Structure formats: structure tokens, C-alpha cells
Regions:
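Gram-negative outer-membrane beta-barrel transporters
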Residues: 448, 553-560, 580-666
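C-terminal beta-signal and adjacent terminal beta-strands/loops
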Residues: 495, 562, 659-668, 692-751
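Membrane-embedded beta-barrel scaffold of Gram-negative outer-membrane proteins
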Residues: 363-377, 480, 488, 525-580, ...
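Flexible loop and strand-edge segments within Gram-negative outer membrane beta-barrel domains
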Residues: 270-291, 297-364, 370-388
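Short acidic/polar hinge/loop motifs at secondary-structure boundaries
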Residues: 57-60, 159, 177-204, 292
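Short, acidic, small-residue-rich periplasmic hinge/interaction motif at the N-terminus
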Residues: 28-33, 38-43, 71-75, 83-129, ...
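N-terminal periplasmic accessory domains that precede
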Residues: 85-91, 136-139, 158-161, 187-193, ...
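Extracytoplasmic beta-strand/coil segments of soluble accessory domains associated
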Residues: 60, 137-178
Length: 751
């Protein structure tokens, strides 16, 4: 494979090293902040590109073309007349105002670029804040690329999947800083309030080598609101009929033309127990969370400096279990089954970047992040505590080779993870503490013919005290064969250390005995590292239907594991086996999507997804459990025109439909008949809706409903009458455990 890379680079490096007639420039927002990934193309042609990490672009100018079109999600499309080769400075305006984008909940803020090399979907805050109380785990309900499922019927925790694989195989990053690793893997998505997020970039398949070696099925990167562009004050209040109450507040202060700071505060609470299905267990955990973030930004565009400093503290407490459980008297006893998960997190991170003023294609950046994450928890008589202290650092340099057709990024990064991990169960008790250290170097080359073809080839070399020394290659290719069509291919390798207990701690809420089968000399719980290759192909076509904008996309991705830590729940209903893969394990994912804007303010999106995920277990090659093969998705959003004579008032409506096909369940064949489930869970459908009344630019209210179809899983928890017995299991959750849920709230801001 490496010979192929060298041969390909050798072919393409000499191309077009002579002067060309091209246009270059930069794209910024209304505060002169660079817009990364903005689309820039010549009107009436298929020649385009996307802006780089500094918002800069270079584009070949075809004969007869004189008008550039620039677009970015959440901003008005802009056309620019070009008369010569003078560098352009293009400033985009928000679709309404930036403040309205921050708190707008309309669905249409999703963009699939035709000119980015990787298969990236960008979601703005209008898409993310669809669920009024949302945290990051609830931000994907209107995006068919991400599946959101409950991990079990007790903790209420949500887990996401991409390309048929669960979140440990997805690299989660905050502003390209890897996060939610190890100790925070299970609950970390619920620790990021949705109102803090400016945008999310979803990358399917192999990611960039710049961000590390762990990504296998894809990457999800979220951007936090920037102090330089934030509004002075924002408030969101929320209440639901399942007794959840939430407050989000942001306050911003611009200290000078270069310095600004924002304080983010979030709190939620649920203290009233409810048991609507009368199984003796509460439907949702009770508890509370306090979440604070102080963010500082420095920006000096003339001198080329930009910097961020983040101080973050979070404390989350949740209690689940039987309705009659009282932790003061029942913890550690068999009086009543209960669980408590208490998490505390503190992090400090900074990012410094410098763009050379005379050569804007050259830049250097430094990232540092320190995190401390502590979780104390128990599930019935099973005890699990983990404290992880982590450091991540990344130094990157960007420049060109000869001209802007040939760009490269190179640098160093390192990680340090100190795990203090203790597990106490009837079958497995021990101290699994360890220290992981790694250092790596990367080089990524980008070729763009400034027209219809580009590719990114990257390689990194890492040394890890437990994973060894290894190479990670990755490749992305983009080709525009005809007008408004984009064809992409990607391939890459990923390697990671499986945190067996932290990533599967929901299984502790059952009677299953944990058994780790080592024996191969593995350094991680006696097991070997996980290694996989991901290959993908995608096609995107934009077109008109009766004069209305429409888009169709289809993609196929396959993941092949060289080694995987297999989680086997089929050997016995009373056991959870963990062992190295001995055979084949793969995940095939096919997705087709269609979207159209049939009328002004009206958007429609529909998608179909097919999964084929199989693993070699002790009992043979079997489908992955709790993974539907078929899924249908549809979303309709409508906004009435703004009434400018009436304080910009309007109505917003949104409806989302999901249908999930049957899913294989872990075997319960050896249980007594009363505690057996069928081999497959039935298909089911859910419907969510939200109505927003905007009274003015500063005030709006909303009401909504989830699971309006009122589908409820029967027997979500096995053996509720004997939770300390051998057949208790809360991990068979494939559908909602409770029925319809309605909520209401308000949003207020000072502009």
C-alpha cells in the first residue's frame, strides 16, 4: 500500500507547476473570523473548492468565467464579480443574524459540500438544537447518518452508532481535540449541552491522520460558540412531563477589539420518580447536573494570531433502580436493587494559532488539553470506580509545495492517560489501573487541481507503550464527473485500546458474570489492541425538480477487523465474555438520502439505511445484536415568513419519523420460559414533533412531543421480580421503555 502512495504522489507532484490563471482569497464571517470549509465555485461550472483551516482558497479560473459563488451553512450565499487576480476578501452575512442562527431550531441548517475531499456533513446549531433540552447525545435525532439508542433500560444513557459500529469506534473531538475517551466514553455525550455548540462536522469513514490513529468508523467534531461572535446574553428554560427541568444561560463580554470571554452555565434536575409501565423500576434516572464553562478568545487578524483558553467543570449525579430503592438504607444490600453513577470532570485546554501575514497559506498551531474525569458508581451489588487523568498535545504546521495546488500539514502529537480503575463483582474483582503513553508524527499531503479533482494522502507513525510501534495510512479522493455531482472514495486504518469495562459498564446492570479470556499475551486486560480497515465510496448529486432545489446522495462503507475485542452475550444469558477475535468481523453500511425544498420555508428529507454487521462468536458467525438491518427516516420542516412589521414574528414546525426493522437479541434460550425473549425484536416506529412561536428576535416559546406513536417495549428488564437472581438483565433495550413525552420551554436573548 505504501508503494502505491509513493507512486501516486510521484505522479501528481510535478503536475501544473507552472503559472496558471487563478483566483485566491479568504472567506470570513461578519466578525472577520475565517470560515473553514466554505464552498467556493465559478458560477455555471463544476470548478470549485472549499476553504482551508485559515478560510483561504485558491481556484483555477476558466476562460470566460467572472463570477464566484460562495456559500456556507447558516450564511447567505454570495456572488462576487472577479475582474483580475487581486486577492479577494469575501465576508458572508448570516441568513438572519448570527444570534438567530445560534438559537434557531430549524432543520435546514445542514450542508454536504461538493468540494471537500472527505465525506463531511456539517450541522449548524439550527439542526443541533432540534430537541429543546438537548445535549450532544440528543442532537442527532434529525440526522439519518447517526443512530441513537438507549444502552440499557435502567440508566437511561444514550449511545450513538455510525456505520453500524458503536461510539468507541468513533473519534469524538471538541474543536479537533480528542475527547470522550476511556472513562467518559459511556456518559460523555450527555455532558455537552446542545446550546453551547456552534456546529458539528460528521466525517464518515477514515478520518484525518492529524487527529490521531483511533478513528475507525468516522469522526464527530463539535465547535463551541466563539466569544468574539457570541451575543451578550442567552437563556433557555425547559420542562417536560417526565419531570425533567433544565436551564441554559450564556453571558458574553467583549473586553476589547481583540479580547472576549463567554461564561456558559447549564443545570438540569429530575427528582420525582415515575413508573408508568408498572415493572417496579423507575422509567428515568433521577438526579442533577451542574455544568460550567469559561471560554476566552484572543484574535488579532492583522498580526495573524488567534488563541483560545477553556476552563470547564461538570458534576453529574444520577440514581436508578427500583421505585422503592433508598440509597441511604439499601446501598450494598439486597433490600432493593439500585444504582448510582456520580461523575465529576474538570478540564483546561488552550489553542494557539499563527498565520504568517505575508504568506497566508503558511500557519502553525499548538493545542494542549488536560482532563480529569472521576466516576464512582455501583449497579446493585456490582461496584465500578474509575479516575482518568489525561493530557493531549498537538503541534501542526501547514504550508504549500511550490504552489497552492500542493498543500501539506505535518506535526507531532502525544497523549498520556493515567487510569485508576477498580471493579468488584461476584465473578470478577480487581485493580485494572494502567498508564498509556504515546507519541506520534504525521504528514498529510493535499492535491487539488483547482477544478474537479483532489485527494488527501496521509500517514502517521506512533509509538505506544501498550500498542507498540505502528503506521497508520489514510486516503481520501474527490472527483466531480459532471455538473453538481461529487464522487468520493476513502480508505484507512485505525488502531485503538479497548477499555473493556468502561465501554461496557451497562452490562453491570444485569446478573451477567464478566469473564475476560486472554491468553495471547495482550497488555490491555490480557487482550490485544483492536485493528480495523475502513473503505468507503459515496456519490452526491444536486439537481432541480420542477425548479426546486433537490439533492440525492448514496454511500457504502465497509469495516474489516484484523482484531476486535469481542463482547459475547450469546454464550450464556448469565455471562458476558470478552475475548480476541478468532475469525471474521465486519460491518457493511449502505445509506441513500433524498432532500428537497418544494416551497419557500418548506424542507423535506428522507433516507433509507441498511446494515450488515457480523462477528465470529464462540457459537459461530452471528449478526451483531441490537442493530436493525433496515431503517427508514423522514423529516418535514416548515417556517412561515417572518413578519417584519410585527417584530419578525413567525411560526416553525418540525416532524421527524423513524422506522426501525427487526433486531437480533442476545440469546435467552436457556432461561426459564418466563424469562425468555424471542430471537428477534419486532420492528417499530416513532414520531417526534416540535412547534415554535417566535414573538420577536429576542423571545420565543416552544412545545414538542417525543415518541408520539406511543410505542413501548414490553419486558425491557428481565426478572424485575428477582433483581438479585440469576436471570435479571436490563440490557435488552431495543426501543423506548416509556410512551409519549411532551415538553415546553422558552428562549430569550439580548442582542
Amino acid at each position: 500500500m505504501y508503494k502505491k502512495y509513493i507512486f501516486l504522489l510521484g505522479l501528481l507532484l510535478p503536475l501544473s507547476l507552472f503559472a496558471q490563471n487563478f483566483s485566491k482569497g479568504s472567506v470570513v464571517d461578519e466578525n472577520n473570523t475565517p470560515l473553514i470549509g466554505a464552498d467556493v465555485y465559478w458560477e455555471g461550472t463544476q470548478i470549485g473548492t472549499s476553504t482551508d483551516n485559515e478560510g483561504a482558497f485558491t481556484l483555477k479560473r476558466p476562460e470566460g468565467s467572472s463570477t464566484l459563488v460562495v456559500s456556507y451553512v447558516g450564511y447567505k450565499k454570495k456572488t462576487v464579480k472577479v475582474s483580475d487576480n487581486t486577492p479577494l476578501h469575501i465576508q458572508l452575512e448570516p441568513e438572519t443574524t448570527l444570534e438567530e442562527v445560534v438559537v434557531s431550531y430549524k432543520r435546514a441548517n445542514t450542508m454536504k459540500s461538493q468540494w471537500q475531499v472527505a465525506d463531511v456533513h456539517t450541522m449548524s446549531s439550527g439542526e443541533l438544537l432540534k430537541a429543546a433540552c438537548c445535549n450532544l447525545s440528543e442532537s442527532f435525532s434529525t440526522n439519518p447518518s447517526i443512530d441513537v439508542n438507549f444502552s440499557d433500560a435502567v440508566t437511561g444513557n444514550k449511545q450513538i452508532k455510525m456505520l453500524g459500529l458503536t461510539s468507541p469506534y468513533i473519534l469524538m473531538a471538541e474543536e479537533n481535540n480528542p475527547t470522550m475517551r476511556g472513562a467518559s466514553q459511556a456518559y460523555g455525550l450527555s455532558f455537552v449541552p446542545g446550546t453551547w455548540i456552534e456546529s458539528i462536522q460528521i466525517t464518515k469513514g477514515a478520518g484525518s491522520v492529524i487527529n490521531g490513529y483511533e478513528s475507525i468508523s468516522g469522526q464527530i467534531n463539535y465547535e463551541i460558540e466563539k466569544p468574539i461572535s457570541a451575543i451578550p446574553f442567552f437563556l433557555n428554560l425547559y420542562a417536560s412531563e417526565d419531570n425533567r427541568y433544565e436551564i441554559n444561560a450564556h453571558t458574553n463580554k467583549k473586553l476589547s477589539d481583540k479580547w472576549a470571554t463567554t461564561l456558559f452555565a447549564h443545570g438540569n434536575v429530575r427528582q420525582q420518580k415515575a413508573d408508568h409501565n408498572h415493572d417496579g423500576f423507575i422509567d428515568n434516572p433521577i438526579g442533577n447536573q451542574i455544568n460550567l464553562l469559561n471560554r476566552w478568545q484572543y484574535a488579532d487578524a492583522q498580526k495573524g494570531w488567534v488563541g483560545f483558553l477553556n476552563l470547564h467543570y461538570m458534576k453529574d449525579e444520577r440514581q436508578a433502580g427500583e421505585l422503592r430503592f433508598n440509597p441511604l438504607t439499601d446501598k450494598g444490600t439486597t433490600n432493593a436493587w439500585g444504582s448510582e453513577v456520580n461523575s465529576e470532570r474538570f478540564s483546561v485546554s488552550n489553542k494557539i494559532g499563527y498565520v504568517f501575514p505575508d504568506t497566508p497559506h503558511k500557519s502553525i498551531g499548538l493545542q494542549n488539553s488536560f482532563q480529569s474525569h472521576k466516576q464512582d458508581s455501583y449497579f446493585g451489588l456490582n461496584r465500578y470506580d474509575i479516575h482518568q487523568k489525561s493530557w493531549y498535545g498537538n503541534l501542526i504546521y501547514n504550508s504549500i509545495i511550490t504552489n497552492t495546488k500542493h498543500k501539506f500539514a505535518t506535526g507531532l502529537n502525544g497523549t498520556y492517560d493515567d487510569y485508576n480503575e477498580m471493579l468488584s463483582t461476584m465473578a470478577l474483582t480487581g485493580d485494572f489501573s494502567r498508564v498509556d503513553r504515546s507519541v506520534g508524527a504525521f504528514f498529510e499531503y493535499t492535491y487539488d487541481n483547482l477544478s474537479n479533482f483532489s485527494f488527501v494522502a496521509g500517514v502517521r507513525a506512533d509509538s505506544h507503550n501498550h500498542l507498540g510501534n505502528f503506521i497508520t495510512p489514510r486516503l481520501h479522493v474527490r472527483y466531480n464527473p459532471w455538473k453538481q455531482a461529487t464522487f468520493r472514495v476513502s480508505a484507512g486504518r485505525g488502531k485503538r485500546a479497548a477499555n473493556v469495562i468502561a465501554e461496557n459498564q451497562q452490562l453491570l446492570a444485569s446478573a451477567r458474570e464478566f469473564t475476560i479470556v486472554g491468553g495471547d499475551g495482550g497488555k490491555l486486560y490480557g487482550l490485544n489492541p483492536e485493528i480495523a480497515w475502513n473503505y468507503g465510496v459515496s456519490f452526491l448529486q444536486a439537481f432541480k425538480v420542477l425548479g426546486k432545489n433537490a439533492e440525492f446522495s448514496i454511500d457504502f462503507y465497509r469495516t474489516d477487523f484484523d482484531n476486535q475485542v469481542v463482547v459475547d452475550l450469546d454464550n450464556s444469558p448469565q455471562q458476558a465474555l470478552f475475548y480476541n477475535l478468532n475469525g471474521n468481523s465486519f460491518a457493511n453500511s449502505l445509506q441513500a438520502e433524498f432532500s428537497i425544498t418544494p416551497a419557500k420555508g418548506l424542507d423535506f428529507k428522507a433516507a433509507y439505511k441498511y446494515y450488515d454487521v457480523q462477528t465470529q462468536f464462540t457459537k459461530g458467525q452471528l449478526e451483531k445484536t441490537l442493530t436493525p438491518k433496515h431503517r427508514w427516516f423522514a423529516n418535514v420542516a416548515y417556517e412561515t415568513p417572518e413578519r417584519h412589521e410585527n417584530n419578525h414574528s413567525q411560526w416553525k414546525f418540525d416532524v421527524t419519523f423513524n422506522w426501525l426493522g427487526e433486531q437480533r437479541l442476545p440469546t435467552t434460550a436457556t432461561n426459564p420460559v418466563v424469562y425468555r425473549l424471542s430471537d428477534y425484536a419486532p420492528s417499530f416506529a416513532t414520531l417526534n414533533a416540535q412547534i415554535t412561536k417566535v414573538f420577536s428576535k429576542t423571545f420565543e416559546i416552544y412545545v414538542g412531543g417525543e415518541n408520539i406513536t406511543n410505542y413501548k417495549q414490553e419486558n425491557g428488564i428481565l426478572a424485575t421480580n428477582d433483581p438479585f437472581g440469576a436471570y435479571f438483565d436490563s440490557t435488552m433495550q431495543y426501543a423506548p421503555a416509556f410512551g409519549q413525552m411532551y415538553y415546553a420551554g422558552l428562549r430569550f436573548k439580548i442582542l
